[in-house]
Amino acid sequence: IVVDGKLIQGPSGISGEWGHNSMPEVEGLKRGRKCFCGRLDCVETWVSGPGLAKSYETQSQKALSALEISDLDVSGESMAGRVLDQYFEQLAGALAGVINVLDPDTLVLGGGVSNIKRLYQEVHTRLGRYVFSDHVGTRIVKAQHGDSSGVRGAAWLWP
């Protein structure tokens, strides 16, 4: 979390660890995914590349990466389209929790799923169902350095 150009770490150094909050209720979510942290249904078990891949595999019995699922969606494969629509709904619900608490100007998405072109419009369209406001002013943008943004950020923070 960055406020006025300064990284906010918090007293425990975990500020921004949004992925280990519980996934909120969204339509079609079938709870019960175990996270590596030992808890069930952490946000990152649903709205990450591996989470998207797990959702697709559960519904299609085929193991594909998030990129492969996105490519199938672009080519018109209906199962990929349905799974991505569910994913966008889940991501909107999860991001709404951040917006409801912080009301940030911008949310920056990184990692492989940030390359899914239709994600940004689809998620923004769905946010209104979950954000406690009549107007959602938060922008959702792709990280400037794409897939490598997390690694670059970690290297930048290294003492």
List each language-model region with its residue ranges:
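Short beta-strand scaffold segments in enzyme catalytic cores
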Residues: I1-V2, N21
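ATP-binding/phosphotransfer module of carbohydrate and carboxylate kinases, centering on a glycine-rich
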Residues: L7, E25-P159
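Conserved catalytic-core motifs of eukaryotic protein kinase domains, centered on the activation segment
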Residues: G13-I14, Y120
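A short, polar/charged loop-to-alpha-helix boundary motif
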Residues: I14-L29
